[in-house]
């Protein structure tokens, strides 16, 4: 990857807290990390994509520690979202009650391999998402998951 980037002379930008990229009706906000310390998972870049009236939150491998940092930073205003990419493959180490209460996703997507050795997603995570009536999709069950949006509505389609 870096060989191709260097060959093309592409300028590299490191994502930083509060960075914003705008293009037409799309806005991309960086919500995390505020600094790089602790575990690699908790240094995951957390991105909020606003497409018109539809909001997505991509949490990478962020765990409860990173969620807590975002919740206590007054400069980070986590949005209520339609679509949440669940942190850390649906592990019990991610998705705190406070984080869920604020983001309140309609759709939650986790990424995990079938019969993975970590047992992802963990039942506690599925239960928490079920309690808020989120529609739950996972790559282990649904295969490829595609979200299509026109900025006013969205639809979910799956491979399986």
For every predicted segment, state its role:
Residues 1-160:
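Non-globular, low-confidence helical/coil segments that flank catalytic cores
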């Amino acid at each position: 990857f870096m060989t191709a980037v260097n060959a093309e002379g592409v300028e590299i930008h490191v994502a930083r807290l509060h960075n914003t990229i705008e293009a037409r009706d799309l806005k991309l906000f960086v919500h995390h990390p505020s600094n790089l310390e602790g575990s690699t998972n908790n240094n995951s870049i957390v991105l909020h994509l606003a497409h018109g009236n539809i909001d997505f939150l991509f949490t990478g491998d962020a765990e409860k520690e990173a969620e807590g940092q975002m919740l206590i930073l007054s400069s980070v205003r986590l949005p209520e979202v339609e679509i949440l990419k669940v942190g850390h493959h649906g592990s019990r180490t991610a998705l705190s009650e406070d984080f869920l209460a604020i983001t309140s996703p309609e759709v939650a997507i986790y990424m995990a391999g079938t019969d993975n050795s970590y047992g992802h997603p963990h039942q506690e995570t599925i239960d928490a998402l079920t309690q808020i009536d989120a529609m739950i999709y996972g790559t282990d069950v649904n295969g490829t998951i595609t979200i299509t949006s026109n900025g006013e509505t969205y639809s979910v389609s799956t491979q399986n």
